[in-house]
Amino acid sequence: MTALVVTGTGTGVGKTVVTAAIGALAHDRHHAVAVVKPAQTGVGPGELGDVDLVRDLTGITDVHELARYPDPLAPATAARRSGHRAVDLDELAARIGTLADSRDLVLVEGAGGLLVRYDAGGATLADLARVLRAPVLVVTAAGLGALNDTALTLEALAHRGLDLAGVVVGSWPAEPDLACRCNLIDLESLAARPLAGVLPAGAGLLARLEFLAVARASLQPALGGTFRAQEFRARYET
């Protein structure tokens, strides 16, 4: 089974756009790709969710939102408030396993960060990654505060024996400040490896073909792109 779990250092760091970028590159290589959102929160009935954005950006139609709760809260809390059933970890892992049996790649995008709770028992995205034996890609912000958030996420991964697939900056500003530029070096130091990619701010607003080109330039070869961390970092040496 080829599954990749995409998490973030928090909410709003660009997980969905990064998930779409990975999916777009695999889809362009004619791989069978499925995208799974275990729980969508903060979106009401009939409104567009994260998997809809992925579909629009990539053309991938094999997308699966497994639960939806209207309140913009952690999945466990949102489920409790809505009165609806929370996501069950074992059922979720089984569904992803079934998808993976006939797909080349299954992308699993979490809600919020790695340790956000999905049910009253405290199951997290980290637990799902462990059950799936899937590597975890960490999406982080570019600027001030990113280092601590990233360090905490990486420490949580290591403590649980989970494999790190890489660290990607989800939204790089057009005019990066000093913190952003310095973080390029420090994020790599935390991860003990080059950055796996840097997506430009606004990438999620692009048309499909433009998005594919940006995805290719913004993700490392292991994720299907041409991004070279050293070359990118050299542009912003401080």
UniProtKB/Swiss-Prot annotation:
What is the taxonomic lineage of the source species?
Bacteria, Bacillati, Actinomycetota, Actinomycetes, Frankiales
Question: What residues bind substrate, as annotated?
Answer: T41
Q: Where in the cell is it found?
A: Cytoplasm
Q: Which reaction does it catalyse?
A: (7R,8S)-7,8-diammoniononanoate + CO2 + ATP = (4R,5S)-dethiobiotin + ADP + phosphate + 3 H(+)
Q: What class of enzyme is it?
A: ligase
Write the protein's name: ATP-dependent dethiobiotin synthetase BioD
What GO molecular function terms would the record report? ATP binding; dethiobiotin synthase activity; magnesium ion binding
Q: Which cofactor(s) are needed, names only?
A: Mg(2+)
Question: What does the UniProt keyword field contain?
Answer: ATP-binding, Biotin biosynthesis, Cytoplasm, Ligase, Magnesium, Metal-binding, Nucleotide-binding
What are its GO cellular component terms? cytosol
Transmembrane: is it a keyword of this entry?
no
Q: Which family does it belong to?
A: Belongs to the dethiobiotin synthetase family.
Q: Where, if anywhere, are coiled coils annotated?
A: none
Matches recorded under NCBIfam families: bioD (TIGR00347)
Q: Which Pfam families match?
A: AAA_26
Q: Which InterPro entries match?
A: DTB_synth_BioD (IPR004472), P-loop_NTPase (IPR027417)
